[in-house]
UniProtKB/Swiss-Prot annotation:
InterPro entries: ARID_dom, ARID_dom_sf, ELM2_dom, SANT/Myb. Residues 372-463 form the ELM2 domain. The gene is ARID2. The lineage of its organism: Eukaryota, Viridiplantae, Streptophyta, Embryophyta, Tracheophyta. It is found in: Nucleus. One of its GO terms (cellular component) is vacuole. GO terms for molecular function: DNA binding. Keywords: DNA-binding, Nucleus, Repressor, Transcription, Transcription regulation. This is AT-rich interactive domain-containing protein 2. SMART domains: ARID, BRIGHT, ELM2. Coiled coil: none annotated. Residues 24-114 form the ARID domain. It comes from the Eukaryota.
Length: 573
């Protein structure tokens, strides 16, 4: 345990477990990345590097020490190579050889650390094209994040990499990940930090004024949040819910608001699911490790809910630098130089976590919900009785109400006669003006009456009375002429003015008259007067043949009758 100095940066003793595993994991990633960089240069160099009398050089520690001092150029300019050699356990006489080793082996790694473009940016759509080792660089970049900032921090945190019990406080350490967990509201109350203890499965934060058991207070807020969420679901217009402000004003509220806790919980779940899938997708060595896709541990209900949102690539700038450690718990105490607020950043990743620092929901290390066990066997099956009733071929309740044919179909056949089905109409009739408008209308009326007598009330039930030219019987001659003039005046958008010109007519009546009467008359005119120049039913120029339905279609007979086939054009409006 240690103390936190309010005036200057000081050491804090922290009990950290699994640091050796973190260092070993980081070393393995470093060795893999080094092989990739050496292969890109096209040069073959022996590994491990040997210096002096056959002493092996720890390239990993050499790279960390140089990068900790802001890189190769700064170390050379400030003449710090002797300090680096002393840290590695070498004599000062081996400094030139050590510099040569660094240039040959770690020069490519140095460029990758300096150039931010080489660090995989998951917000970029072209990140998948960075190379097959993008997942390795992703994890290695997070592990070296505190050491690869190119000298932006004056003091570095080396407890992660080398297992020290002293953790230096950095002025900007994990500044990008401070949004994960911070208590900035405590600064206004003057709360001071007293001690930090990290264990394998629990994180206990002891503070002086009113926050002795922080985790218990957060747990007490959970039932209240769930009750508020249930109230919103059952009664969304209840005044007790209150007014939720715009997201831009959420910073003015503390974490005690239920609606703010719900929003944070939703975002945490989305980030957790997204980063788990990205870790599986972009990991280049998943074929050699016992890594399973997270969807294997989820039931069907979760997989259905997964379709409601898309995959959101995580931003490396918002993640912590502890992804190299599986099962480790890391603490970073950071204090702003502006002395405005004191931030406590706690990153606790589970041993079986997929990506450290990506799950806000698991930072309290709550127990996993056990999967539902489905027992299989003859002792766990439902007892279903055998079906003893006979099957029914058809059931009238599924067929609806019978309308046609009627029940007394035999009596109907005797009334109508024995007309052959499919006989068709005769080619000629006994009418005086066979083939003209009056003749055609007469035969249509005969068939309509025949159908009406056969169907009975079903004729009106099927609305046959609202089909054909009978629709115009409910229209006057003046209304028909006005409808025709309206279409001629504006044929493209006459429907917009139809309600104004015919305020007493319903739209259903207007549409029925247009398709059953108006278009039929126009087609009749085109077929009989201009049979050689028919384009479509919506032509601009049209006429009419005969009067309205129910009146004499042709007023003269004999030789004075108009022979339609000899007429080229007619504009009889």
């Amino acid at each position: 345990m240690g103390s936190f100095n309010d005036t200057s940066c000081s050491y804090v003793d922290v009990e950290i477990k699994y640091v050796d595993e973190c260092e070993e994991r980081l070393r393995r990633l470093f060795d893999q990345a080094l092989l990739v960089f050496l292969e890109e240069e096209g040069s073959i160099k022996p590994l491990p590097a040997v210096i002096g009398d056959g002493k092996n050089v720890d390239l990993f520690k050499l790279f960390v020490l140089v990068r900790e001092r802001e890189g190769f150029d700064t170390v050379s300019r400030k003449r710090l190579w002797e300090v680096v050699a002393e840290k590695l356990g070498f004599d000062c006489s081996l400094v030139p050889s050590l510099i040569l080793i660094y240039l040959k082996y770690l020069n490519r790694m140095e460029k990758w650390a300096v150039e931010e473009s080489r660090i995989v940016n998951w917000d970029n759509k072209d990140s998948e094209k960075k190379g097959c080792y993008s997942g390795m660089l992703h994890e290695l970049g997070n592990g070296f994040k505190s050491l690869l900032d190119n000298g932006k921090c004056q003091k570095r945190n080396r407890a992660v990499a080398f297992g020290c019990n002293h953790m230096e406080e950095s002025c900007s350490e994990f500044d990008r990940s401070r949004k994960r967990f911070r208590e900035s509201d405590d600064d206004d109350k003057g709360v001071g930090l007293s001690s930090v203890v990290i264990r394998e499965e629990t994180v206990v934060c002891a503070v002086e004024e009113g926050l002795s058991d922080f985790s218990l207070e957060k747990r007490d807020d959970l039932p209240g949040m769930l009750k508020w969420l249930a109230l919103v679901a059952t009664s969304p217009h209840d005044p007790a819910i209150g007014v939720i402000p715009h997201s831009s004003k959420w910073k003015q509220y503390n974490g005690n608001k239920c609606w703010l806790q719900v929003a944070r919980a939703k975002n945490s779940l989305l980030v957790q699911r997204d980063n788990a899938e990205l870790r599986y997708r972009y990991h280049p060595f998943r074929g050699h490790q016992n890594i399973h896709h997270p969807s294997m541990y989820e039931d069907d209900r979760k997989s259905i809910g997964r379709l409601r949102y898309s995959i959101r690539p995580p931003n490396l700038s918002k993640h912590c630098s502890s992804s190299c450690c599986n099962g480790s718990s890391l603490v970073s105490l950071s204090k702003s130089r502006s002395t405005k607020c004191r931030k406590l950043t706690i990153i606790a990743s589970e041993r079986a976590g997929l990506t450290a620092g990506t799950s806000r929901a698991r930072k309290r290390n709550k127990a996993e919900i056990p999967r539902r066990c489905i027992k299989v066997g003859h002792q766990h099956q439902a007892q279903v009785d055998e079906w003893t009733e006979s099957g029914v071929d058809s059931d009238s309740k599924w067929l609806g109400t019978r309308i046609w044919p009627p029940e007394n179909s035999e009596a109907l056949d005797q009334t109508l006669g024995n007309d052959l089905v499919g006989k068709g109409r005769p080619d000629s009739c006994s009418c005086e003006l066979s083939g003209f408008v009056e003749c055609t209308r007469l035969h249509i009326a005969e068939k309509r009456m025949e159908l009406k007598r056969e169907l009975g009330d079903d004729f009106f039930h099927w609305r046959f009375n609202q089909m054909g030219e009978e629709v115009c019987l409910r229209w006057t001659e003046e209304e028909e002429k006005r409808f025709k003039d309206m279409i001629i005046a504006d044929p493209q958008s006459f429907w917009t003015n139809a309600a104004k010109n015919f305020p007493k007519k319903k739209r259903e009546e207007l549409v029925s008259y247009y398709f059953n009467v108006f278009l039929i008359n126009r087609r009749r005119y085109q077929n009989r007067v201009t049979p050689k120049s028919i384009d479509s039913d919506d032509e601009g120029a049209f006429g009419s043949v005969g009067g309205s339905f129910g009146r004499d279609a042709v007023t003269s007979s004999g030789s004075d009758v108009m022979i339609c086939a000899q007429n080229r054009q007619c504009e009889d409006y």
